[in-house]
Amino acid sequence: MTNDALIAALAHLVSEGRNPDTMDIDLLPSLDIVQRLNQQDKLVPLAVEKVLPEIALAVDKITDAFKVGGRLVYMGAGTSGRLGVLDASECPPTFGVSDKMVVGLIAGGPEAILKAKEGAEDSPVLGEQDLKDIKFTNLDVVVGIAASGRTPYVIGGLEYANEIGATTIALSCNPDSPIADIADVAISPVVGPEALTGSTRLKSGTAQKLVLNMLTTASMIRLGKSYQNLMVDVKATNNKLVARAARIVMQATDCSKEQATEVLKQTDYEVKLAILMILTDLDIESARAHLHHQDGFLRKAVESHQPK
């Protein structure tokens, strides 16, 4: 695309428009500046609320993929790519899953997480190649993230995923975007022009983060990774998480700190297993087998077994 064509294309994007509510932001003192930013930020959850049906549909497709061994792959450039990498990296400690289950790809590779890599987003071929490099298959789901909805790197990835029959999801902050047109599910929270014109790391980035939170959290809940609203598959990999594991067991069972700690040590800090043992009086092997029989759903395991 020529420079003139690109300028014309950007002129039609909501996310590139000038915000009439912040035209004088350069004249304001600090408190007034952050108040204006805060006023704009308040619009974000309202925009996300309007696309909850699409988010729920995406959750169902992601959950279905997980159940057959598929992966969730995020791909984006710049802020969009970094947000995908961030959400993917939080899944193993939060939900006790493999770091291969949710993958974040950013245009330009890992180096682009810390420092912008100029031109990386302009290649659709690079998007396709990055998916090929991780052996992306039709069992997987790809979420293309682009505030503008027109990033070539993301378009290339989505088109390749479509070619091999994988599920494609587009996350953009502009209506009727190019990536929305080629995806199975289009999630488009329109947050309006940014407080600082074109700086889509602001409202657009916040909206994307909220949506990504929902996609992984809701999908993991659907897989039985929570009991009530407790993170029962959390991995106790540091002192804070060891303490959190004990608190979760105490909250789920009303047991003492001493009992929670003792049983957690028996289970090698498998929180879900410790809770089931305390609530049902099962020994560790019986509890493990019963939990497996209920496909890892702790609530089902508890409700289907009465204490001795």
Curated annotation (Swiss-Prot):
Biological or metabolic pathway of the protein: Amino-sugar metabolism; 1,6-anhydro-N-acetylmuramate degradation; Amino-sugar metabolism; N-acetylmuramate degradation; Cell wall biogenesis; peptidoglycan recycling
GO BP: 1,6-anhydro-N-acetyl-beta-muramic acid catabolic process; amino sugar catabolic process; N-acetylmuramic acid catabolic process; peptidoglycan turnover
CDD domains with a match to the protein in the record: SIS_Etherase (cd05007)
EC class of the enzyme, as a word: lyase
EC numbers: 4.2.1.126
Family matches, as InterPro entries: Etherase_MurQ, Glucokinase_regulatory_CS, MURQ/GCKR, SIS_dom, SIS_dom_sf
Active site: 90 (proton donor), 121
Signal peptide region: none
Reactions listed under catalytic activity: N-acetyl-D-muramate 6-phosphate + H2O = N-acetyl-D-glucosamine 6-phosphate + (R)-lactate
SUPFAM superfamilies according to UniProt: SIS domain
Pfam families per the UniProt record, alphabetical: GKRP-like_C, GKRP_SIS_N
Domain SIS: 62-225
A molecular function (GO) term: carbohydrate derivative binding
Entry keywords, A to Z: Carbohydrate metabolism, Lyase
Note: A lyase-type mechanism (elimination/hydration) is suggested for the cleavage of the lactyl ether bond of MurNAc 6-phosphate, with the formation of an alpha,beta-unsaturated aldehyde intermediate with (E)-stereochemistry, followed by the syn addition of water to give product.
Known partners and oligomeric status: Homodimer.
NCBIfam families: N-acetylmuramic acid 6-phosphate etherase (TIGR00274), PRK05441.1 (NF003915), PRK12570.1 (NF009222)
HAMAP family (UniProt xref): MurQ
Function summary: Specifically catalyzes the cleavage of the D-lactyl ether substituent of MurNAc 6-phosphate, producing GlcNAc 6-phosphate and D-lactate. Together with AnmK, is also required for the utilization of anhydro-N-acetylmuramic acid (anhMurNAc) either imported from the medium or derived from its own cell wall murein, and thus plays a role in cell wall recycling.
Family: Belongs to the GCKR-like family. MurNAc-6-P etherase subfamily.
Protein name in UniProt: N-acetylmuramic acid 6-phosphate etherase
Organism: Vibrio campbellii (strain ATCC BAA-1116)
Lineage: Bacteria, Pseudomonadati, Pseudomonadota, Gammaproteobacteria, Vibrionales
Gene: murQ
